[in-house]
Amino acid sequence: MRASLLLFILLVYLAHAPQAQGVFGPRRCKGKLGYCRSKCQSKQVELGKCSTKAICCGISTGTSSSQGSHEVPVINSEPALESKPEPQDTQEEEATMVSE
């Protein structure tokens, strides 16, 4: 009876261990960007587009071990707004002042 209970607990643990964060499973990214698959890739993708479980890899080292894994900082997906020079209406203003 005890052996079957221990075997059942072991099977449940093994079934759910890869999903847990920590030593046995991949660390999940808390941001929106990360790497798909169990090995690090050179390209980051949105985690919602990953068909497999996503892990966070070290950016500088590129390691996928649980010691080298860490959160990938969220990169702003919106393009930076370029500061455009304002149109110069000074000539029109000067022209209206002269004509008055």
UniProtKB/Swiss-Prot annotation:
Residues 1-22 form the signal peptide. It is found in: Secreted. Disulfide bonds join 29-56, 36-50, 40-57. Keywords: Antibiotic, Antimicrobial, Defensin, Disulfide bond, Secreted, Signal. InterPro entries: Beta_defensin_dom (IPR025933). One of its GO terms (biological process) is defense response to bacterium. Highly expressed in kidney, lowly expressed in spleen, and expressed at lower levels in lung. GO terms for cellular component: extracellular region. Residues 23-26 form a propeptide. Residues 89-100 have a biased composition (Acidic residues). Coiled coil: none annotated. Residues 60-100 are annotated as: Disordered. Belongs to the beta-defensin family. Has antimicrobial activity. This is Defensin-B4. It comes from Ornithorhynchus anatinus (Duckbill platypus).
